[in-house]
Amino acid sequence: FVLETLKNLALQQQNYTVLLPLSYGDKAFADKIVESAYTTLSCDIKTLRNFIPLGDYQQILSEVKIAIFGMKRQEAAGNIFQLLNMGAKVFLRKENTLLHWLRKRDFMVYSLEDDIEELAQLTGLTDKQIAHNRSCYTKTFNNTVYKEMMDKLLYNE
């Protein structure tokens, strides 16, 4: 779904690189994704097939301007949260519960199906939008929130 969506965008003309982080999950499926990407897209493709040191991975994520996740279920939440905090424009499938969870907390996230015009522009977030998402991140992920969650979990309060 994502590769077909990307095929219609002007990735090559704008010198974009598609990053495929495939270091976990089914290796045979990852092979199919890589093969399909090379036959479908006409731009640079970078694959991550092995785990790398966390600092190196975070450096790669910090360079991502647009992140597209095509899964229908809640997966890759840690990557999505980090990308939002690092300033990436994130697109999720509209049936992905994480899209709704993030929007409920006022994050600026986009639906892959409903916001296709936004995706087609191939622009990242503005500085104001990045600051907004970082503020949402700080409100959502902090020690006070973690303590409250643990108290509810452990003490059913």
Show where each model-derived region lies.
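Acidic donor-binding loop of glycosyltransferase active sites
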Residues: 59-75
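A conserved mid-protein helix/loop that constitutes part of the nucleotide-sugar donor-binding site
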Residues: 1-10
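Conserved active-site histidine-acidic residue motif and adjacent donor-binding/catalytic loop
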Residues: 48-60, 96
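Short alpha-helical segment that forms part of, or immediately flanks, the ligand-binding pocket
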Residues: 58, 78-86, 99
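Nucleotide-activated donor-binding/catalytic signature segment of Leloir-type glycosyltransferases, i.e.
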Residues: 32-51
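Short hydrophobic beta-strand element within catalytic cores of glycosyltransferases
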Residues: 89-92
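A charged, aromatic-enriched C-terminal amphipathic alpha-helix characteristic of glycosyltransferases
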Residues: 119-157
